From Swiss-Prot:
Residues 203-234 are annotated as: Negative regulator of microtubule-binding. InterPro entries: KIF2A-like_N, Kinesin-like_fam, Kinesin_motor_CS, Kinesin_motor_dom, Kinesin_motor_dom_sf, P-loop_NTPase. The microtubule tip localization signal (MtLS) motif; mediates interaction with MAPRE1 and targeting to the growing microtubule plus ends. In complex with KIF18B, constitutes the major microtubule plus-end depolymerizing activity in mitotic cells. Regulates the turnover of microtubules at the kinetochore and functions in chromosome segregation during mitosis. Plays a role in chromosome congression and is required for the lateral to end-on conversion of the chromosome-microtubule attachment. Residues 164-188 are annotated as: Disordered. This is Kinesin-like protein KIF2C. Belongs to the TRAFAC class myosin-kinesin ATPase superfamily. Kinesin family. MCAK/KIF2 subfamily. It holds the Pfam family KIF2A-like_1st. Interacts with CENPH. Interacts with MTUS2/TIP150; the interaction is direct. Interacts with MAPRE1; the interaction is direct, regulated by phosphorylation and is probably required for targeting to growing microtubule plus ends. Interacts with KIF18B at microtubule tips; this interaction increases the affinity of both partners for microtubule plus ends and is required for robust microtubule depolymerization. Phosphorylation by AURKA or AURKB strongly reduces KIF18B-binding. The lineage of its organism: Eukaryota, Metazoa, Chordata, Craniata, Vertebrata. Signal peptide: none annotated. GO terms for biological process: attachment of mitotic spindle microtubules to kinetochore; cell division; establishment or maintenance of microtubule cytoskeleton polarity; metaphase chromosome alignment; microtubule depolymerization; microtubule-based movement; mitotic metaphase chromosome alignment; postsynaptic cytoskeleton organization.
Length: 721
C-alpha cells in the first residue's frame, strides 16, 4: 500500500465512482497519508465539484495502479557472480529510455527471470561503468545494442510485476466488469463519521424513550398534564420552604399588599387539574407557567412575585385576618381611615375570605373578615383608653354595579353619589345602622349578602358581579371619628369570559375593568404621597375618596389566586396587578430566587399559543379605545336622560291624581277644571325638558350603535387571530 501512496500525487487523473454508481475521471487535489484517503476534483455543469475517497476505493476502481509499480534501476540489471557493486562508490547511470506510454499500462506482460533475456551487444547504446575492487583491476562492460530494438528492450523491465499482484488485479477487474452495480465500495471518512453520529443519536433517543417510559410508570398518565405535574414535583423537591406562621411578627405598612392561594376545589379535582402555584416563603410566591417551545418541547417558566405576605392553601381566614385587616382596626380608633380590598379572579375565594365560609348559597358570616373586624372593634371600644370617647358603632352595606350604587340593607334602593359644598363625597340615601355587638353585625352581613348581585361565569355558577363595600363607622356625638371600609371586589376576568355576550354583560365588564384601573392608580397615589388622586375615574374610587386622602389613611389589598393550570393566565394577571400597586420587585425578597426554566423532552401534536404582531396590537388597541369611548359616552348620556326624566316627573302635573279624582261620585267639577287648567299650563312650561330629553335619547341611541359596532370589530379580530 505504501507503494500505491507513492504513485498518487496531486494532479494525477484517476477514475472515481459516484454515489449513484457513475464512474468518471477526476484529478487528485490532495493526498492525506494519515487518513489514507485522497481528495479529488472534477468539473460538472460548469462548476467544480469534489469529494474525499479512501485509498482502498481508489485501488478497487483503478487496478492498473497496482500493476505500474516502478522498479529501481539496479533491479533491472542481471546478477553476475564476478561483479561486486560497492554501495558508496556507485556512479550514476545515464539512460535515454523514453517515457512509458499510457497504452502500455493496461498490457499484462510477465517475465520469468531477467537472466533469460539475451540482448545482442550491437543494439545497446547505454553504457554502465562499474568500479572494480582494488585487488582486481579488470573492467566489465554491458554489451551494446542496436538503436532499432530499443523500445522493445525498455518495456520489459518496467512492466515486471509479481504473479500474485497480477492475479489480484485480474480478479478485481473480472469481478468489477461482471457485476459493476453490486461491487462493494469502502466508505469514506465523512460517511463513517456520519454513521457514527447517526448511531449515537439513535442510542440517545432510545435512552430517552426508556426514561420517558420509566417516568410514565411512576405517574398517572391519564392526567391531561402529568408531564408538567412531574416537573413541578421535581422542582418543589429542591425548594427550601419556610411558610408564614402565626408566631411571625406583624409588620406595619401604610400600603400592605398580600397574596392568598386557595386549594384546588371539587371541580378542579374532578378535571384532574394540577397545582401550578408554590409558596416557598412568607413573602415569595412562584408561578410554574406551562410553556411549549417551537419544537413542541414542554418546559416550565417559573415566575417569582414578592409581596408583604404570602399565604399558602393551608392558611385559614384567622391567619389571613391577623396579618392583613387586624392591624388596620387600631387606625380607625386613632381617627383615621382604613380600607381592605379583596381582589382576584372569579372563584378565587374573595367572598369566602371577606364574608365567611360558603355552603351553596348560604354563608357562615362569623368566619369572615367582616365579622372578625367587628369583634375587634367592640373589644377595643370597651378598653379603658377608648371608653371615655363615648364611641358609637354604625355599619353600612352597599354595592356598586354598572356604575350605580345600591343599598343592600334597604331593599337594594338606588343611591346617588354627590359632592357637597365642602367637596366631601356623600352617598345620598345610604342607611346607617347602629349596632351594639358583633352578633348584630353578623345579622347585617347575612341580610346584605343575600341581596348582592350575582351572575354566572365559566369559573363560578354564582359569581358576585358587583363591588360590595361593608363599612364600620365610629361616631362620637354624631361626628365621624373613624371609618373602616372592607371591599369585596368583582372578578377581574369578565371581559375575557364573555367575548360574545350581550350589551349588558359588556357594560358590566367594562365598568369592572375601569373601576379596577382607577383603584390601582388611587392606591399608588396614596403610597407615593401624590398631590392629585384620580378618584373621579370611577364610582368605586369616588365613594372611597376619603380613604385615599389624609396622612392617617392605610390600605391593605389581598390578592386572591386560583392554583389550577386552567387559571394560570388569570392568576398571572392578578399577581401583576397587585405587584404594580406597590411596585415590589421579585428580586427584593429575602430569598432572591431567580426565575428558572425546566425542560423535558415531550413532543405534542399541536400548540395553542398565539401571539400578536405590532400592527395587530395597534389595530386592536384603536378598536378597544373606540369601545371605551362609546361606553363612557353611554354612561354620561344615561345620567343626563335620568336627570331630565326626574325633572319632568317632579315638576310636571299629576295626571293620575286628576283621573282618580273623577272616580269619586261627588267630586267637585269646579276643582277638577281648575286643576286641569293648571296642569296644562305646567305641561306647556315643560316643553324644554321634553325637547332636551328627546335630544339626549337620540344621542344615547347613536352611542349604543357605536358601542355595538366596536364590540363586533374586537370580537371579529380576536377570532381571526
Amino acid at each position: 500500500m505504501e507503494s500505491l501512496h507513492a504513485r498518487l500525487f496531486p494532479g494525477l487523473s484517476i477514475n472515481i465512482q459516484r454515489s449513484n454508481g457513475l464512474i468518471h475521471p477526476a484529478n487528485i487535489s490532495t493526498v492525506n497519508v494519515e487518513k489514507s484517503c485522497v481528495s479529488v476534483e472534477w468539473i460538472e455543469g460548469g462548476t467544480t465539484k469534489g469529494k474525499e475517497i479512501d485509498i482502498d476505493d481508489v485501488a478497487a476502481i483503478n487496478p492498473e495502479l497496482l500493476q505500474l509499480l516502478p522498479l529501481r534501476p539496479k533491479d533491472s540489471l542481471p546478477l553476475q557472480e564476478n561483479v561486486t557493486v560497492p554501495k558508496q562508490k556507485r556512479k550514476s547511470v545515464n539512460s535515454k529510455i523514453p517515457a512509458l506510454k499510457e497504452g502500455l499500462r493496461s498490457r499484462s506482460t510477465r517475465m520469468s527471470t531477467v537472466s533469460e533475456v539475451r540482448i545482442p551487444a550491437q543494439e545497446n547504446e547505454m553504457e554502465v561503468e562499474l568500479p572494480v575492487p582494488t585487488n582486481s583491476r579488470k573492467q566489465f562492460a554491458i554489451p551494446s545494442h542496436p538503436r532499432a530494438s530499443c523500445s522493445t528492450v525498455t518495456e520489459l523491465p518496467l512492466l515486471m510485476v509479481s504473479e500474485e499482484a497480477e492475479e489480484q488485479a485480474h480478479s478485481t477487474r473480472s469481478t468489477s466488469s461482471a457485476n459493476p452495480g453490486n461491487s462493494v465500495r469502502r466508505k469514506s471518512c465523512i460517511v463513517k463519521e456520519m454513521e457514527k453520529m447517526k448511531n449515537k443519536r439513535e442510542e440517545k433517543r432510545a435512552q430517552n424513550s426508556e426514561l420517558r417510559i420509566k417516568r410514565a410508570q411512576e405517574y398517572d398518565s391519564s392526567f391531561p398534564n402529568w408531564e408538567f405535574a412531574r416537573m413541578i414535583k421535581e422542582f418543589r423537591v429542591t425548594m427550601e420552604c419556610s411558610p408564614l406562621t402565626v408566631t411571625d411578627p406583624i409588620e406595619e405598612h401604610r400600603i400592605c399588599v398580600c397574596v392568598r392561594k386557595r386549594p384546588l376545589n371539587k371541580q378542579e379535582l374532578a378535571k384532574k387539574e394540577i397545582d401550578v402555584i408554590s409558596v416557598p416563603s412568607k413573602c415569595l410566591l412562584l408561578v410554574h407557567e406551562p410553556k411549549l417551545k417551537v419544537d413542541l418541547t414542554k418546559y416550565l417558566e417559573n415566575q417569582a412575585f414578592c409581596f408583604d405576605f404570602a399565604f399558602d392553601e393551608t392558611a385559614s381566614n384567622e391567619v389571613v385576618y391577623r396579618f392583613t385587616a387586624r392591624p388596620l382596626v387600631q387606625t380607625i380608633f386613632e381617627g383615621g381611615k382604613a380600607t381592605c380590598f379583596a381582589y382576584g379572579q372569579t372563584g378565587s375565594g374573595k367572598t369566602h375570605t371577606m364574608g365567611g365560609d360558603l355552603s351553596g348559597k348560604s354563608q357562615n358570616a362569623s368566619k369572615g373578615i367582616y365579622a372578625m373586624a367587628s369583634r375587634d372593634v367592640f373589644l377595643l371600644k370597651n378598653q379603658p383608653r377608648y371608653r371615655n370617647l363615648n364611641l358609637e358603632v354604625y355599619v353600612t352595606f352597599f354595592e356598586i354595579y354598572n356604575g350605580k350604587v345600591f343599598d343592600l340593607l334597604n331593599k337594594k334602593a338606588k343611591l346617588r353619589v354627590l359632592e357637597d359644598s365642602r367637596q366631601q363625597v356623600q352617598v345620598v340615601g345610604l342607611q346607617e345602622y347602629l349596632v351594639t355587638c358583633a352578633d348584630d353585625v353578623i345579622k347585617m352581613i347575612n341580610m346584605g349578602s343575600a341581596c348582592r348581585t350575582s351572575g354566572q361565569t365559566f369559573a363560578n355558577s354564582n359569581s358576585s358581579r358587583s363591588h360590595a363595600c361593608f363599612q364600620i363607622l365610629l361616631r362620637t356625638k354624631g361626628r365621624l371619628h373613624g371609618k373602616f371600609s372592607l371591599v369585596d371586589l368583582a372578578g377581574n376576568e369578565r371581559g375575557a369570559d364573555t367575548s360574545s355576550a350581550d350589551r349588558q354583560t359588556r357594560m358590566e365588564g367594562a365598568e369592572i375593568n375601569k373601576s379596577l384601573l382607577a383603584l390601582k392608580e388611587c392606591i399608588r397615589a396614596l403610597g407615593q404621597n401624590k398631590a392629585h388622586t384620580p378618584f373621579r375615574e370611577s364610582k368605586l374610587t369616588q365613594v372611597l375618596r376619603d380613604s385615599f386622602i389624609g396622612e392617617n389613611s392605610r390600605t391593605c389589598m389581598i390578592a386572591m389566586i386560583s392554583p389550577g393550570i386552567s387559571s394560570c393566565e388569570y392568576t398571572l394577571n392578578t399577581l401583576r396587578y397587585a405587584d404594580r400597586v406597590k411596585e415590589l420587585s421579585p428580586h427584593s425578597g429575602p430569598s432572591g430566587e431567580q426565575p428558572v426554566q425546566m425542560e423535558t423532552e415531550v413532543m405534542e401534536a399541536s400548540s395553542n399559543g398565539t401571539s400578536l404582531t405590532g400592527n395587530e396590537e395597534e389595530e386592536l388597541s384603536s378598536q378597544m379605545s373606540s369601545f371605551n369611548e362609546a361606553m363612557t359616552q353611554i354612561r354620561e348620556l344615561e345620567e343626563r336622560a335620568l336627570e331630565e326624566l326626574r325633572e319632568i316627573i317632579q315638576q310636571g302635573p299629576n295626571w293620575l291624581e286628576l283621573s282618580e279624582m273623577t272616580d269619586q261620585p261627588d267630586y267637585d267639577l269646579e276643582t277638577f277644571v281648575n286643576k286641569a287648567e293648571s296642569a296644562l299650563t305646567q305641561q306647556a312650561k315643560q316643553a324644554k325638558h321634553f325637547s332636551a330629553l328627546r335630544e339626549v335619547i337620540k344621542a344615547l341611541r347613536l352611542a349604543m350603535q357605536l358601542e355595538e359596532q366596536a364590540s363586533k370589530q374586537i370580537n371579529s379580530k380576536k377570532r381571526h387571530q
